[in-house]
């Protein structure tokens, strides 16, 4: 029964979800695969400043609060209420983990901000993942492709099966979207000579926009859909996927899975300062798993050798362990990520608005550079962001088979 009728029993979580349905705004669906949110540090968005994880945390807190009978005051642990000087959380976590999880192969990277689980087969990984996830930290898991049918994810295989379909393709240089035959995209995926040219003769840097996604993915590619790992989390029907437990009358967001495919720009001579990416800076509205299932090797005139690509990657501000991976001949790098904690969103937003004004761009009151995904923060800007706002970039190289798991509220660009 409702709490108003019986104070001894609190409302159920479903009751609270139902009565709060009008308040929940799931926001943008430009995200990947949902995990059940376990924390919320996302920046305020919109006029209300409320995000979905914030509201759900409030709901769960209300359930706990309403379960306490009014005639029995909760016991307060005085020691827990008296807080000492803040400690280095990262150091505490690492010291504790090294003792409790000695049977797990793991490392801390990016100034101890990201957990790297090196053995995807270890059945105890979830224990350490859970501890890290409570802190709202990104997680990197290596070797996930070894659990998958690699032949399904080759560019050649996808082109052969679906090349006759039409899809929206974005040119990352000028942000122009065109609807074209999928085969044209895949023909130039590894052969630079077959890539489209723009009006000035430059080679286009193309991205296949979220094709296919959600229910379309399952219907179009059932074999690939069921080849995806972590179905209990990643499947729309997964028991540990919070979205699968929402009441039926909710408008369900498209949380994937989706296939994200793009040409690489690091292999080309003409890009020196990496001023563009294939995914601009944006904020995640749900927890996300991104698995690098295939890395194409570009060939043709104007393409750097593998050693040349590695040299360019080494110019990035990388963790020592990532530099070591680059030198491992068995590893194949495929994507460069820049990740930021959700708590830094306001500073980043203010910084980008400042840069826009410096460049003479119009900054409207309702303009949000993060929500609009209008910026790729290049190396010079990342340095300024650190010097002027104290926001440090977490740079991660994603190798073939790596799964990058980001909590809701995190920001990233690729």
Residue ranges with predicted function:
Residues 8, 15, 20-41, 47-54, ...:
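N-terminal low-complexity, Ser/Thr- and acidic-residue-enriched intrinsically disordered segments
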Residues 92-137, 145-403, 410-414:
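Active-site region of the double-stranded beta-helix
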Residues 33-35, 76-78, 337:
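Hydrophobic transmembrane signal anchors and adjacent membrane-proximal interface regions, especially
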């Amino acid at each position: 029964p409702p709490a108003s009728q019986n104070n001894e029993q609190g409302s159920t979580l479903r009751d609270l979800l139902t009565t709060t349905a009008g308040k929940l705004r799931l926001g943008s669906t430009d995200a990947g695969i949902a995990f059940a949110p376990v924390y919320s540090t996302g920046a305020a968005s919109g006029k209300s400043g409320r995000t979905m994880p914030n509201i759900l945390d409030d709901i769960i807190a209300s359930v706990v609060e309403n379960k306490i009978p009014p005639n029995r005051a909760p016991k307060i642990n005085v020691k827990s209420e008296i807080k000492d000087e803040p400690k280095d959380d990262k150091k505490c976590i690492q010291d504790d983990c090294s003792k409790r999880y000695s049977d797990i192969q793991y490392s801390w990277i990016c100034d101890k901000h990201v957990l790297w689980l090196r053995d995807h087969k270890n059945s105890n990984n979830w224990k350490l993942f859970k501890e890290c996830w409570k802190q709202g930290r990104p997680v990197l898991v290596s070797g996930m492709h070894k659990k998958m049918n690699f032949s399904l994810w080759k560019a050649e295989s996808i082109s052969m099966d679906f090349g006759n379909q039409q899809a929206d393709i974005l040119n990352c240089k000028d942000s122009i979207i065109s609807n074209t035959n999928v085969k044209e995209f895949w023909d130039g995926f590894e052969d630079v000579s077959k890539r489209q040219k723009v009006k000035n003769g430059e080679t286009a840097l193309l991205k296949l926009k979220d094709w296919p996604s959600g229910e379309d993915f399952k219907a179009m590619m059932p074999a690939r859909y069921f080849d995806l790992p972590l179905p209990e989390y990643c499947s729309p029907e997964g028991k540990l996927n919070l979205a699968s437990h929402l009441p039926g009358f909710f408008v369900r967001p498209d949380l994937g899975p989706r296939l994200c495919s793009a040409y690489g720009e690091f292999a080309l001579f003409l890009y020196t300062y990496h001023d563009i990416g294939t995914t601009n800076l944006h904020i995640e509205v749900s927890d996300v798993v991104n698995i690098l299932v295939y890395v194409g090797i570009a060939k043709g005139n104007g393409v750097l050798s593998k050693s040349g690509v590695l040299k360019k990657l080494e110019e990035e501000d990388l963790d020592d362990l990532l530099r070591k991976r680059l030198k491992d001949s068995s590893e194949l790098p495929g994507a460069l990520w820049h990740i930021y904690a959700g708590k830094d969103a306001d500073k980043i937003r203010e910084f980008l608005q400042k840069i826009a004004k410096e460049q003479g761009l119009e900054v409207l009151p309702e303009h949000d550079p993060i929500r609009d995904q209008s910026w790729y923060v290049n190396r010079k800007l990342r340095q300024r962001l650190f010097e002027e706002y104290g926001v440090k970039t977490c740079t991660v190289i994603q190798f073939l088979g790596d799964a990058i798991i980001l909590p809701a509220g995190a920001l990233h660009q690729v």
